[in-house]
Amino acid sequence: MIKLGTHLSIAKGFANAAETAVYIGANTFQFFSRNPRGGNAKEFDEKDIIKFQEIRKENNFAPLLAHAPYTMNLGGTKDDVYEFATRVIDEDIRRMDSLGIEYMCFHPGSHVGGGVDFGIDRIVKGLNNAIKGDENITILLETMSGKGTEIGFKFEQLKSIIDKIEHKEKIGVCLDTCHIFSAGYDIVNDLDGVLEEFDKVIGIERLKTVHLNDSMMPFGDKKDRHAPIGEGKIGLKALIDFMEHPSLKHLPFFLETPFDDEGHKRELKMIKEILSSK
C-alpha cells in the first residue's frame, strides 16, 4: 500500500490534524514540530495526544514526519542564532520522540558567508550534541535547492555531515523532488542515474522519506518554488515514475504543494487513481 500524505497544521491540535489526514484520504502526514517562524514550543495537551494516538492506531497510519522550524539554522556564523538552533533541535528530538513520531526532518542550514566546511562543522556539532543514541526517532537531513548559501544541495555535502555523526544509525535523508530538480539532479530524464549517484555517495538505505513536490522553476535554477503535482516543470509523468521506482515505492511520500485541505484531497485522489490504474 502506498504511504501518502501532505503537510498539515497542528494549530488546532494533533487529533484534528490526524482527523484531517483521514478526511483527505491520507494515511500519514507531516507537521511542524513547533511554530515554523516562532520560538518556544507549546506544551502538549494530554487529551489531544491520547485522541491523536487512537486515530493513528485505528487508521493504521504509516510513519509520521515532523518538520523542524525554518528559523533554525545550525550552519551560520551568529552565535545567538546557533544557540537557538541547538536548543530547538535538542528539545524537538525529545518532544517528537515522546509522541512516537518516526522521523523529523530539517533544513541543514546556511553558512551565510562562513563557508561550506565551517557550516558543515557547525551542523555536525549541533547534531552530535542533540542525538544521544537512545532515541527511537530518526533525524533526516533534507535535500536543498541551493539558493543563497544553503548547505545540502549536493549529495556530497550531506555525506560530509553524515560521515561525522557519532550515532549514524539515527540519521537519514528526506529527499525533496522540487529541491533536487532545482539543484541540478535530473529526475525527469535520468532518474536511475540520480538514484545511482545517491546510492554511491550516501547510500540508498539512508533515504527514509520523500517530499513529493513539482517545481515552478526550471531545471537547475536553484530556487525553491513548489508547484501542484503535474503543474510544474517536473511534470506528472516524472513524479509518478518517481513514486513507482523499485528503490522508492516503499517510502512515505509527503506533499508540500500550495493547496488547502480540499485541494490536497483532490490531489491525493488523482495520484492514487493513477497508481491504481497501472
Swiss-Prot record:
Residues that coordinate or bind Zn(2+) 1: H67, H107, E142
Keyword Nuclease: yes
Residue numbers binding Zn(2+) 3: H179, D224, H226
Catalytic activity: Endonucleolytic cleavage to 5'-phosphooligonucleotide end-products
Keyword Isomerase belongs to the record: no
Key words of the record: DNA damage, DNA repair, Endonuclease, Hydrolase, Metal-binding, Nuclease, Zinc
Family: Belongs to the AP endonuclease 2 family.
Name of this protein: Probable endonuclease 4
Natural source organism: Clostridioides difficile (strain 630) (Peptoclostridium difficile)
Lineage of the organism: Bacteria, Bacillati, Bacillota, Clostridia, Peptostreptococcales
Gene field: nfo
